[in-house]
């Protein structure tokens, strides 16, 4: 009774006397949707005491809900007895709950709504509520939604606004009136705008937010107390709403401790709303709320957004959340919750978990960070599944990895990486063998990751390769046995690919057999590599795959492939993998900056992993050191960083050196290699040390550390290092250096390298030495030079040191030169004297020492540069005498024009002696040094050097002549300029070394502009692109595209037209190809003829590839005006030479390289994986640009180019020029690209349009015929000796070409001397050589008349048709050249229609009655011999094959036979007339259609 009395007191505010029952009934009738608001006075009465009315009623109802009052007291009886309607209570609760769902609600009303919802839940908790119909699904859902709606939105929390008293929710009573129809969208949007404006005045303090949060917490706790008691099994929509609200609350606030949501605990132990939310989700999963796994499926579906870090809410599209620590924690809690459910529910939940995992894969955000977290979540959940379920999912993942969607294939790799970080599962023997393989890491690497390395999408290939590299790194830390076995230890499979110098281990790291799961499955997935390799069968080789990927067109793929390669090499013995080391060092010069950086990084990592491997040390030096000259500063800095890290930073004092320190040992090993096998890298090191010296990198401590090694086993590298840094660091221990000099110079056979470095150091410190010491060293050096005891390398260093010593001893330049003349004059005199004894005395060469003579000549050249005043003519004569050869008289100067012949003659005194080539080679260098100082000598010597270049057979001599000539070109530019053609001829030298040397030297001269692009030089230079040596061709491409083109961007464009004339050796144009050339030049550089067409096209395409779009646009117009128009207008004659030229021209115009980049490039959608707004904007810009350019290009093409093409076509047809074939091919492409524009263009001349359409149809038929003949070329003849011998392979041509004069027998022409192809033999008909069996054939096919393609085709088709029906053939059977004519009466039998060919291709040739060949068929009405008579059996207009056959069957056949004793009629010119044109109408001039071009270039 106490409880009932308290209930009555609590109900007092909720039972107003003036409450209209109609309002309550309306609320229930409208299902708690919209109704008129509550009377304000009644609302004021309830909330008069604030929350007291809510809390007092709650306290009164609670004992009845919890059962504390006992079983005797019933609340429902009390309601009836006291005339209290529970419907009224629910309606009043609804009023306050509904207010919360509005936007402009104050803190107080939010609290009222939350408490009202709590009262409704409490009333539902009271036993008997269902029977008394307290529950209403809409009211229930609105109370649940209050948990979300009552909390202010983020926009409200973040606004800064003035705090004002919030407006009453009753401000607009009429707004919630029932509406008869749905509101219009405009009204809703206006309402939202008004509400937002009203909402501007609301502000929430921290205290306000705390009150709202506490109210939500208590309401949620009350609701969770209801859930175990109140079944929602029959209320699926309510369950769904509960799940959505609970999931949204999991992200309500951070949970500062680990949340155990499934533990049985009292609700009052929970402290955070997310804890309660997860507990609510757990309660919903109990059987009381639904059977089976329906509820769990709904829960997981909502949890998916939390796991994928997406916004939680309604709608299919959910934006990704910013990746913050709170979002990550929420994801972790969601995964923990699902894991706990799996642990508890076991098998019953496995199917739902598998669906969840698949949905994670399908809906993950395609951004790197989101994919990584999603993969981690997936793997954590997957680890909870038993082996059977795990294997089933991996099987599904394998199929998912072959999805057609790129993001799916990328995410698979993230999942595989995460799986590989876990320990491998033990084999479950209960599984089938088919499923056991899915448990192994080997399957993940082999079947999924490796396959994606061959994916057709570059982003997937790159991701797979980087994953592969990461996988290899995992083997070091986690020691995964399966991966180690896969990459290192498995000896079970054989090597499938080997390369010279490469040892591929017999391990699955390099070759392994694919385990196919089900070959009968349809392969609809993406499984084709970009290189065309089919993925999915056969053996695979990791190293072979990597080599392909390192050459991939995409930068990121190459970069990732390098990472994988280095990861493998780190764990391998590289002794047999030289090719892979070469690949690594070559990638340091990749075109892409990021790849070069990665290659530097990878090589350094490999060297650090195996610091004592000499091969890796050499590869590192060859790869890293040259990059200090890189044009990209960031790459150069990276190379300098690695050099500093490995070379300089590890140099300690010798007393601190010990062999166990890998870093110190490595540093000195690298320096030693730089002084021995890798000396050629010294020039790059000079650049590095120059940069370091500017940064004051070399401290006194560092220098002393280096000096401490000079007397040790590291002496040579230490002196090399000192020679590099001495110039920038004068503070050296001079006494130590002089002591070392005295010690080593007194040795009989000192180390040349070390001695040279010491002399270099002495030269740098000369100005700091005492005068006495300096003079002493000077005398010693001079003495050694006079003694000729040192090697050539030391002589150069000694001369340099001598110059520096004299400079240090002198105070003025004049004094320095005087001192040099005095010191060096003695050495010069000694050289002169020794040479005179050998060269000028009789029998002087008989007992000469070649090595000494070389030293005399070499020393003379170096010393003479320091004292030019002491060099006399006698010395010139001596060097010229050494160069003279007795064979000179046998050679005549090459014809270079009359003006150059005298200059090529050597002076008379340079004849008569014979010297070995090594001496003559050194003499050339010395002569060049002398010429640099003496211009008169240069004038006399240059012609002789040029002649030596042409007649000398020794490679060393020719090489040195080129070097000298190019040096003299810098000193005497004008003098040498006229001999540049002679130098450029060396680009076709027989020796590859000379060709490459010439290429390098000419490139240097062109870069510095000592040589200009004039005459034949450009064409000589580009001919290196087709050099037989691939390295030279590649280097030529580099020089042209990356060095010379950058200095002169229009160079290729300016020379392109002349290239076409020049390489076809066409000299009839008044402007092009008019520079002088000797016959030898023409012979060496000739690319004329069909056999060289492919090489010419390679040059053209290379030039076009490096055009800008503007240049491509202009070159098309320029080609038409400068080449095609000249032939169309009759300015240039149309002959066979012109045919080759035009053939090249049309092939150029048809090539893809001449198409604008903006037109042929497609946006690389593979690169737009991560929703990059900037990338999408660029794609839109590209499309707009492409559309604009297309319009301009089409206009230019239609107005300026098409008229020329049409006019030229007519001329080619008239003259029967073979290039018509290429023109038709080009025209076909044009008609495909500009179909609509051409229709507009030909609208004014329908006759011309009809003719062109007819010609294109005929050309298409010819192409079909060619394909047919190519297929049946081997069955053209018949079997048996008595039958006709087969006609030789028929050249597939568009036209008949007369045999050139003097070529009587076409069988002996070059076109027939080898098997013909359509490309190689166009324009000729090849007939087999005469044999006894071909008598009739020879009579019917005269030698001087090759047949056209159509004639041959008809002969073959008719012959096969007759033979197919004839069993008994006469031995005199011949191939009869008869035709079924379909032309006008004026046409002769040589003019052929495609009638019989069309019949043959359709299989519709009519059968002929058996008869002798000489007997006319009974239906033939006339037989004629050899006359130009034809029987018209086909329509006058082009028609289908069926119509032609019908016309054919209605008439009688005519058989036209050539009279054996009468010569055949001469072939008429082939001219296809349009059916739409009258035969008497003269051909109109198409040139009148051509307009002035939009723009032409020079």
Curated annotation (Swiss-Prot):
Sample GO molecular function, one term: histone binding
Primary site of residence: nucleus
Residues with PTM Phosphothreonine: 1331, 1379
HEAT repeat coordinates: 441-475, 537-572, 579-610, 973-1009
Regions annotated as coiled coil: 1219-1275
Subcellular location: Nucleus
Region (Disordered): 155-188, 514-533, 889-911, 1306-1339, 1429-1498
Entries under Pfam families matching the protein: Cnd1
Gene Ontology CC annotations of this record: condensed chromosome, centromeric region; condensed nuclear chromosome; condensin complex; membrane; nucleoplasm; pericentric heterochromatin
One BP term from GO: positive regulation of chromosome segregation
UniProt biased composition (Low complexity): 889-903
Keyword Cell division: yes
Biased composition (Basic residues): 1487-1498
Alphabetically ordered keywords of this record: Cell cycle, Cell division, Coiled coil, Disease variant, DNA condensation, Mitosis, Nucleus, Phosphoprotein, Primary microcephaly, Repeat
InterPro entries assigned: ARM-like, ARM-type_fold, CND1/NCAPD3, Cnd1_C, NCAPD3
Subunit-level organization: Component of the condensin-2 complex, which contains the SMC2 and SMC4 heterodimer, and 3 non SMC subunits that probably regulate the complex: NCAPH2, NCAPD3 and NCAPG2. Interacts with BRD4 (isoform B), leading to insulate chromatin from DNA damage response pathway.
Clinical disorder: Microcephaly 22, primary, autosomal recessive: A form of microcephaly, a disease defined as a head circumference more than 3 standard deviations below the age, sex and ethnically matched mean. Brain weight is markedly reduced and the cerebral cortex is disproportionately small.
Job description of the protein: Regulatory subunit of the condensin-2 complex, a complex which establishes mitotic chromosome architecture and is involved in physical rigidity of the chromatid axis. May promote the resolution of double-strand DNA catenanes (intertwines) between sister chromatids. Condensin-mediated compaction likely increases tension in catenated sister chromatids, providing directionality for type II topoisomerase-mediated strand exchanges toward chromatid decatenation. Specifically required for decatenation of centromeric ultrafine DNA bridges during anaphase.
UniProt name for this protein: Condensin-2 complex subunit D3
């Amino acid at each position: 009774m106490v409880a009932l009395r308290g209930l009555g007191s609590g109900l007092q505010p909720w039972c107003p006397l003036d409450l209209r029952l109609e309002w309550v009934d309306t609320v229930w009738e409208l299902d708690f949707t919209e109704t008129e608001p509550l009377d304000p006075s009644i609302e004021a009465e309830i909330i008069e005491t604030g929350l007291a009315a809510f809390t007092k009623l709650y306290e009164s109802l609670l004992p009845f809900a919890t059962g504390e009052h006992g079983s005797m007291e019933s609340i429902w009886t009390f309601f009836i007895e006291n005339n209290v309607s529970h419907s009224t209570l629910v309606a009043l609760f609804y009023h306050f709950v509904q207010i919360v769902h509005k936007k402009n609600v104050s803190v107080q009303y939010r609290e009222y709504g939350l408490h009202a919802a709590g009262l409704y839940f409490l009333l539902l908790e009271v036993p008997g509520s269902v029977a008394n119909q307290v529950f209403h699904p809409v009211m229930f859902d609105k109370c649940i939604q209050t948990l979300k709606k009552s909390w202010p939105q983020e926009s409200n929390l973040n606004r800064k606004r003035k705090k004002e008293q919030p407006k009453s929710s009753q401000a607009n009573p009429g707004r919630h009136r029932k509406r008869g129809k749905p509101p219009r969208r405009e009204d809703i949007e206006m309402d939202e705008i008004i509400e937002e404006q009203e909402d501007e005045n609301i502000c929430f303090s921290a205290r306000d937010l705390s009150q709202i949060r506490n109210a939500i917490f208590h309401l949620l706790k009350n609701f969770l107390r209801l859930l175990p008691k109140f079944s929602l099994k029959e209320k699926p929509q309510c369950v769904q709403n509960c799940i959505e609200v609970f999931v949204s609350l999991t992200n309500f606030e951070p949970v500062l401790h680990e949340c155990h949501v499934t533990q049985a605990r009292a609700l009052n132990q929970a402290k955070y709303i997310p804890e309660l939310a997860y507990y609510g989700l757990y309660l919903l999963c109990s059987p009381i709320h639904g059977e089976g796994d329906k509820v769990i499926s709904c829960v997981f579906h909502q949890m998916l957004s939390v796991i994928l870090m997406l916004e939680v809410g309604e709608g299919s599209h959910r934006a990704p959340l910013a990746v913050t620590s709170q979002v990550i924690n929420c994801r972790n809690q969601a995964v923990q919750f699902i894991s706990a459910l799996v642990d508890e529910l076991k098998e019953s939940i496995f199917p739902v978990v598998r669906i969840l995992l698949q949905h994670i894969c399908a809906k993950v955000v395609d951004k790197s960070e989101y994919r990584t977290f999603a993969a981690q979540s997936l793997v954590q959940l997957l680890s909870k599944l038993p082996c059977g379920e795990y294997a089933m999912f991996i099987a599904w993942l394998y199929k998912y990895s072959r999805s057609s969607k790129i993001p799916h294939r990328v995410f698979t790799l993230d999942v595989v990486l995460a799986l590989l970080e876990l320990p491998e599962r033990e084999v479950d023997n209960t599984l089938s063998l088919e499923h056991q393989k899915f448990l192994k890491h080997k399957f993940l690497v082999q079947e999924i990751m490796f396959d994606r390395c061959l994916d057709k999408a570059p982003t997937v290939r790159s991701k797979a390769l980087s994953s592969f590299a990461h996988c290899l790194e995992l083997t070091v830390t986690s020691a995964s046995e399966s991966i180690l076995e896969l990459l290192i230890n498995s000896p079970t499979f054989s090597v499938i690919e080997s390369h010279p110098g490469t040892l591929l281990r017999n391990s699955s790291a390099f070759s392994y057999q694919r385990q196919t799961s089900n070959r009968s499955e349809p392969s609809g997935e993406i499984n084709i590599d970009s290189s065309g390799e089919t993925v999915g069968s056969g053996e695979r080789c990791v190293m072979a795959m990597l080599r392909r990927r390192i050459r991939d067109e995409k930068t990121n793929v190459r970069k990732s492939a390098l990472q994988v390669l280095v990861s493998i090499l780190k764990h391998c013995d590289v002794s047999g993998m030289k090719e892979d080391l070469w690949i690594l060092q070559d990638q340091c010069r990749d075109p892409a900056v990021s790849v070069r950086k990665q290659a530097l990084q990878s090589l350094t990592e490999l060297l650090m992993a195996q610091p004592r491997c000499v091969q890796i040390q050499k590869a590192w030096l060859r790869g890293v050191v040259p990059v200090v000259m890189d044009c990209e500063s960031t790459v150069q800095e990276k190379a300098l960083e690695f050099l500093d890290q490995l070379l300089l930073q590890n140099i300690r004092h010798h007393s601190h050196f010990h062999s166990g320190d890998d870093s110190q040992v490595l540093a000195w090993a690298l320096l030693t290699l730089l002084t021995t096998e890798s000396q050629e890298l010294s020039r790059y090191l000079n650049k590095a040390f120059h940069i370091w010296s500017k940064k004051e990198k070399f401290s006194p401590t560092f220098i002393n550390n280096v000096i401490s090694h000079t007397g040790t086993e590291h002496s040579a590298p230490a002196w090399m290092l000192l020679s590099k840094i001495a110039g920038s660091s004068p503070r050296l221990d001079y006494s130590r250096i002089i002591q070392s000099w005295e010690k080593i110079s007194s040795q009989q056979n000192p180390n040349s390298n070390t001695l040279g470095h010491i002399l270099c150091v002495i030269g740098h410190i000369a100005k700091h030495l005492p005068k006495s010491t300096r003079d002493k060293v000077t005398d010693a050096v001079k003495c050694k030079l006079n003694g000729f005891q040192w090697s050539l390398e030391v002589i150069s260093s000694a001369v340099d040191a001598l110059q520096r010593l004299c400079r240090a001893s002198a105070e003025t330049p004049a004094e320095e030169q005087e001192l040099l003349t005095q010191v060096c004059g003695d050495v010069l005199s000694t050289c002169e004297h020794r040479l005179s004894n050998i060269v000028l005395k009789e029998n002087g060469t008989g007992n000469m020492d070649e090595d000494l003579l070389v030293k005399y000549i070499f020393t003379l050249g170096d010393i003479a540069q320091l004292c030019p005043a002491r060099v006399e003519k006698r010395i010139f004569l001596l060097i010229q005498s050494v160069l003279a050869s007795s064979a000179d008289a046998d050679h005549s100067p090459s014809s270079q024009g009359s003006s150059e012949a005298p200059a090529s003659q050597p002076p008379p005194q340079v004849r008569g002696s014979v010297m070995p080539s090594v001496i003559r080679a050194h003499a050339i260098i010395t002569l060049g040094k002398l010429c640099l100082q003496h211009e008169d000598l240069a004038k006399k010597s240059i012609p002789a050097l040029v002649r030596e270049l042409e007649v000398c057979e020794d490679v060393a001599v020719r090489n040195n002549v080129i070097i000298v000539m190019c040096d003299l070109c810098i000193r005497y530019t004008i003098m040498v300029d006229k001999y540049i053609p002679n130098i450029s001829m060396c680009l076709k030298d027989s020796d590859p070394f000379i060709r490459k040397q010439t290429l390098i030297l000419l490139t240097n001269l062109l870069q510095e502009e000592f040589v200009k692009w004039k005459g034949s030089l450009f064409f000589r230079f580009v001919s290196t692109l087709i050099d037989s040596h691939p390295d030279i061709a590649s280097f030529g491409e580099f020089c042209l595209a990356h060095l010379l083109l950058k200095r002169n961007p229009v160079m290729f464009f300016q020379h392109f037209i002349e290239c076409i004339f020049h390489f076809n050796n066409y000299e009839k144009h008044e402007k092009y190809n008019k520079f002088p050339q000797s016959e030898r030049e023409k012979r060496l550089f000739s690319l004329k003829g069909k056999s060289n067409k492919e090489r010419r096209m390679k040059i053209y395409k290379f030039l076009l590839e490096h055009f800008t779009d503007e240049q491509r646009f202009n070159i098309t117009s320029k080609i038409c005006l400068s080449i095609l128009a000249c032939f169309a207008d009759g300015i240039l004659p149309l002959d066979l030479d012109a045919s080759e030229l035009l053939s090249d021209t049309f092939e150029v115009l048809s090539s893809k390289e001449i198409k604008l980049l903006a037109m042929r490039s497609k946006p690389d959608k593979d690169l737009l994986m991560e929703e990059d707004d900037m990338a999408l904007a660029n794609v839109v810009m590209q499309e707009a640009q492409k559309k604009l350019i297309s319009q301009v290009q089409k206009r230019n093409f239609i107005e300026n180019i098409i008229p020329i093409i049409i006019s030229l076509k007519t001329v080619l047809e008239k003259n029967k020029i073979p290039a018509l074939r290429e023109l038709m091919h080009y025209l076909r492409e044009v008609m495909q690209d500009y179909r609509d524009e051409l229709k507009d263009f030909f609208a004014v001349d329908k006759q011309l349009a009809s003719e062109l359409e007819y010609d294109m149809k005929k050309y298409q038929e010819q192409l079909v015929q060619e394909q047919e003949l190519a297929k049946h070329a081997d069955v053209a003849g018949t079997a048996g000796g008595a039958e006709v011998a087969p006609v030789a392979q028929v050249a597939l041509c568009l036209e008949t070409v007369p045999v050139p004069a003097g070529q009587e027998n076409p069988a002996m022409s070059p076109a027939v001397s080898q098997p013909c192809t359509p490309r190689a033999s166009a324009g000729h008909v090849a007939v087999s050589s005469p044999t006894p069996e071909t008598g009739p054939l020879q009579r019917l096919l005269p030698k001087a008349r090759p047949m056209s393609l159509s004639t041959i085709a008809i002969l073959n088709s008719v012959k096969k048709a007759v033979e197919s029906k004839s069993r008994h053939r006469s031995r005199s059977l011949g191939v009869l050249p008869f035709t079924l004519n379909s032309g006008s009466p004026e046409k002769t039998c040589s003019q052929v229609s495609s009638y019989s060919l069309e019949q043959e291709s359709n299989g519709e040739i009519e059968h002929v009655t058996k008869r002798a060949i000489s007997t006319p068929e009974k239906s033939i009405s006339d037989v004629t011999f050899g006359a130009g008579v034809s029987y018209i059996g086909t329509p006058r207009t082009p028609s289908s094959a069926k119509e032609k056959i019908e016309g054919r069957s209605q008439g009688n056949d005519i058989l036209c036979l050539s009279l054996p004793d009468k010569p055949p009629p001469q072939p008429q010119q082939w001219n296809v007339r349009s059916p739409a044109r009258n035969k008497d109408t003269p051909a109109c001039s198409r040139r009148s259609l051509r307009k002035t071009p939009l723009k032409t270039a020079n």
